[in-house]
């Protein structure tokens, strides 16, 4: 239960208590139950239509929030995962492969979090090593060779900052991805489905279109990290989240992203299939627009999109 959900939790408890009493004591409490359920529906709508940035950060971090591998079966047909960077090893924190979207062959890449402690250790909590980014780039260049559109799912706190990752060239691998992605001659569409953290997110995020689920975040640093750097107090993370403009609607207003994808009431985890189908609909919409561009126009469109971010007109 998240902090802002406490009022809803209390109403649910009352409903459960009345249902239990009704069943145990064989008394008719249905009118009271119906009133509380109507109240719960109203309050749920009120809460989730007035979320603060910090509330959305909490939703984006929910362990039960759908991951890349949860969405893929609903969006792509006949997906086959491909492994390895051909230099060191495979990285389970970065998955990728080929499949079909609406009958067309495509390449799919995404960061992958775990579902439980064991899985998170295997997936390194969704924080990719250099080999993960090199695998992603290998699949992107393969997609370019065979003229396949590329779809990426961004869902990471950031690239793994460990000693071994740095020794194997973490910064170089991300920098190379940024450079190579900028000049790809096929459509590239990215969607932020959870946390989009720093260079770890950008390493697969240089795309013609950047989409975000409405309760996802996209930032250069976590709110806790920003608060610690700016005010020497990570407890001020809520204020940092407000200041940083890391939510989907803020970033749309700033021109950083191209479209916000609505989530089911309560978050994507409430209806995984419906959320996946919403993502698929947006993928098809933007792909159809990008198909009108030549290979050179696609590369120029992507380059200019990111080149103008942060520009100031006096």
Curated annotation (Swiss-Prot):
Residues 32-289 form the CoA carboxyltransferase C-terminal domain. It is found in: Cytoplasm. GO terms for molecular function: acetyl-CoA carboxylase activity; ATP binding; carboxyl- or carbamoyltransferase activity. It catalyses: N(6)-carboxybiotinyl-L-lysyl-[protein] + acetyl-CoA = N(6)-biotinyl-L-lysyl-[protein] + malonyl-CoA. It comes from the Bacteria. Gene3D superfamilies: 2-enoyl-CoA Hydratase, Chain A, domain 1. Keywords: ATP-binding, Cytoplasm, Fatty acid biosynthesis, Fatty acid metabolism, Lipid biosynthesis, Lipid metabolism, Nucleotide-binding, Transferase. Pathway: Lipid metabolism; malonyl-CoA biosynthesis; malonyl-CoA from acetyl-CoA: step 1/1. It is an enzyme of class 2 (transferase). SUPFAM superfamilies: ClpP/crotonase. Pfam families: ACCA. One of its GO terms (cellular component) is acetyl-CoA carboxylase complex. NCBIfam families: accA, AccA_sub, PRK05724.1. Acetyl-CoA carboxylase is a heterohexamer composed of biotin carboxyl carrier protein (AccB), biotin carboxylase (AccC) and two subunits each of ACCase subunit alpha (AccA) and ACCase subunit beta (AccD). Belongs to the AccA family. Component of the acetyl coenzyme A carboxylase (ACC) complex. First, biotin carboxylase catalyzes the carboxylation of biotin on its carrier protein (BCCP) and then the CO(2) group is transferred by the carboxyltransferase to acetyl-CoA to form malonyl-CoA. PANTHER family: ACETYL-COENZYME A CARBOXYLASE CARBOXYL TRANSFERASE SUBUNIT ALPHA (PTHR42853), ACETYL-COENZYME A CARBOXYLASE CARBOXYL TRANSFERASE SUBUNIT ALPHA, CHLOROPLASTIC (PTHR42853:SF3). This is Acetyl-coenzyme A carboxylase carboxyl transferase subunit alpha. It comes from Staphylococcus epidermidis (strain ATCC 35984 / DSM 28319 / BCRC 17069 / CCUG 31568 / BM 3577 / RP62A). The gene is accA.
């Amino acid at each position: 239960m998240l902090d802002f959900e406490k009022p809803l939790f209390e109403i649910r408890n009352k409903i459960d208590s009345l249902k239990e009493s009704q069943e145990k004591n064989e008394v008719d409490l249905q009118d009271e139950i119906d009133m509380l359920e109507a109240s719960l529906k109203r309050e749920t709508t009120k809460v989730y239509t007035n979320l603060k940035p910090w509330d959305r950060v909490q939703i984006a971090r929910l362990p039960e929030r759908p991951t890349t591998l949860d969405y893929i079966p609903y969006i792509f047909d006949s997906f086959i995962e491909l492994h390895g960077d051909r230099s060191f090893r495979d990285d389970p924190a970065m998955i990728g492969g080929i499949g079909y979207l609406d009958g067309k062959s495509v390449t799919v890449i995404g960061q992958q979090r775990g579902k439980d402690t064991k899985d998170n250790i295997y997936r390194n909590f969704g924080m990719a090593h250099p080999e993960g980014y090199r695998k992603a780039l290998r699949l992107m260049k393969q997609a370019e060779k065979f003229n396949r559109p590329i779809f990426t799912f961004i869902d990471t706190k950031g690239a793994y900052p460990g000693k071994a990752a740095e020794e194997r060239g973490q910064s170089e691998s991300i920098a190379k991805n940024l450079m190579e992605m900028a000049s790809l001659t096929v459509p590239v569409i990215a969607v932020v489905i959870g946390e989009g953290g720093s260079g770890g997110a950008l390493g697969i995020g240089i795309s013609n279109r950047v989409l975000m689920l409405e309760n996802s975040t996209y930032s250069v640093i976590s709110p806790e990290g920003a608060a610690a750097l700016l005010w020497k107090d990570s407890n001020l993370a809520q204020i940092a989240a407000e200041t940083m403009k890391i939510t989907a609607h803020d970033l749309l207003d700033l021109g950083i992203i191209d479209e916000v994808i609505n989530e089911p009431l309560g978050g994507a985890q409430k209806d995984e299939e419906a959320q996946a189908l919403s993502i698929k609909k947006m993928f098809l919409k933007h792909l159809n627009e990008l198909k009108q561009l030549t290979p050179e126009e696609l590369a120029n469109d992507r380059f200019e999109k990111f080149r103008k971010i942060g520009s100031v007109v006096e």
